[in-house]
Amino acid sequence: AYTCFGLACIVSPEIPNNAGSLAPFSVRAPEGSILNAVYPAAVCTRHIIGQMLPDTVFGCLAQAVPDRVPAEGAGCLWNVTFRGETDRGSNDTKIFCITAVTNGGTGARPSKDGLSATAYPSGVRGTPVEINESVAPIIFWRKEYSPDSGGVGKHRGGLGQVIEIESAIEADLE
């Protein structure tokens, strides 16, 4: 589906993404490969590989229709997972685990700039700092666009981020 999505974005972006619009495409991968895993292969994070496929397809299609293909961006989600214990040593010790969703920018598009701090192809934006800080003992000292990280050119890539996170308690984050 991710591969077909990449094809549809370039070949027919005006057509809705559904079973009917994807039916003309056929994609095959060798059995046993990372794209066609065979039981009992571990596939827990297969969505990460899947989210990288549209950029791979774009790289192939750029050879045939370079004026329709966006530049490669930061790719899919870049998540940072923290875990630890609160109030270590007290009777009220709790274990926490949080995944902070962070993103780079998308590549420049053929007729406009890329999107800043947005995962592609999902379009997922980052988790607000306030939500992360309310559910885990962490402090975001800084979360801002990285100036000029979109590169130069007629159309620039979306901006990435600079993020600084620290433990809010006297305990290490894992």
Residue ranges of each PLM-predicted region?
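Glycine/proline-enriched, intrinsically flexible loops and inter-domain linkers
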Residues: A1-E174
